Structure formats: structure tokens, C-alpha cells
Amino acid sequence: MLKGKTAIVTGSSSGIGLGVARALAGQGANIMLNGFGDTPETVAKLKTEFAAMGVKVDYNPADVTKPDQLAAMVDAAHKNLGGVDILVNNAGIQFVSPIDQFPIEKWDAVIATNLSSAFYATRLVLDAMKTKGWGRVINIASAHGLVASAGKSAYVAAKHGIVGFTKVTALESAGTGVTSNAICPGWVLTPLVQKQIDAIVAKDGISNAQASEKLLSEKQPSKQFVTPEQIGGLAVFLCSDAAAQITGSAYSIDGGWVAQ
């Protein structure tokens, strides 16, 4: 379905981003992988995996909080992969603390990584997508882009911001063949979430399985993790012709979290 298209997926060396990149490559899209601090061995393994899928693949270590590094990654995608047809803004970090104890530098880092980076990247690719008459901007938001949780002020602010930014991008691209949508996952067993599970294990002195169940029970009625593969499947749908008139939307994939 996506043969001949090229996708940049930020934060795609693991977790949700890798799941999305695999799903897009499975439909024939060339992939620009991105990670920060990945080892040469990890990069080589990823390139081998994607090349075996029959698509072109490149890797760029851009720090998504640095506009000049994102610009260099976009230039590399044009030079090595033929352009940018799909942009998936996925890179994110988390920090948990009450507002009155939240370190300012941590706030700045979360906003820069989770929100500002999407603006930096989108502004670099939007004009070319409009000129081409086809493009997909997919922002990985969160259930926390729609509802809040205590202790996550920066993350919630950033993810609410991503949903709003998605809508503005959709309005400014309406009628051009470019769409902009957000995916709002609930709990996904990524390295980011595993850290929160580890914290519960340490605090409560319970097993990993018990901590996982406790985490899920607090928010996610299905009591099952969303998988990166499921999120990748939704991203593929949003790139399809069937989704050509879906824009400015925020799709929950959260086991019923925000239905409560």
C-alpha cells in the first residue's frame, strides 16, 4: 500500500516508534529510523532487519530537541530515501513529580522532547507534502493528551499540546492531500512504562507481574497492555486511502481508559 513512500519515525529504535516503523515498512514504505544514544550494534541490527523487508532504510541519531539536527535528518531522508511522505512524531520522555517539586529543567526537557520537537519536524516537511499533494503527519500523543493524572504535569501539558497542534496542522493542510492525526495510546509496555513498573516494585515490594497489574488496574479497564504492533496497525490505516478524509482527529487506543 505504501510502496514508494518514505516515512520518518522519531524515537524508532525501540518501543512504539519501532512498532510503527515495522508496520509502515511492512506496507512497503522506506524508513528513516531515529534514535538518540543507540549503539552501533543496535543500529546495524535494525538496518539489517528493515533491509530484509525489501525497503530502503537509513538511520539518523538526531536529537529531536535540536532543530538543526532535525533539519539534517530531513535532508538525509530526501537525499537517501527520496523525500518525506509520512512523518511520525513519536519521540518522548517522562518525569513524574508534584508540581511544587517539579524541577524546571525536567519540565523544559519534557516539553522540548514531547511537544516542541513535533513542531520543529512538521514545519520542515509540510510544504513539500502540500506541493506533492499527499502526506501524512501522525503524532503519537497519549491518553494523557485527553485526560490527566497527578504527578505528570509536564507530560500531560505536552500531550494535550500535541493534540491541539495536530488540529492546527490539519486545518492548515485541509484540501491539500495532507492529513494530520494523533494516536492516543494507553499503557504500552515500553522501556518508559517499565521504569514506572520498576518504581512500583521497589516502593511496594511486589513482583513485576503484580506491579504491572496494579498499574493497569488504576486506569485501563481491559487490564491488558496496548502493543506497539496495534499502534502500528492504526498508523497504517491513517496512511491509507480509506483515511484520506480523516484529519484533525485524536484516536484513542487505550483499553477503555478515557471511556470512563
Q: Positions of the model-derived regions?
A:
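Conserved glycine-rich cofactor-binding loop
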Residues: 6, 13-15
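Conserved glycine-rich Rossmann-like NAD(P)H-binding loop of the short-chain dehydrogenase/reductase
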Residues: 27-44
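C-terminal substrate-recognition "lid" of short-chain dehydrogenase/reductases
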Residues: 81, 119-120, 126, 130, ...
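Substrate-binding pocket helix/loop in short-chain dehydrogenase/reductase
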Residues: 98-99, 103-111, 216
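Active-site helix of classical SDR
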Residues: 122, 158, 166
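Residue(s) in the substrate-gating loop at a strand-loop-helix junction
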Residues: 142
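Short, small/polar-rich loop/turn modules that mediate ligand/substrate recognition or access, typified
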Residues: 174, 179, 246-248
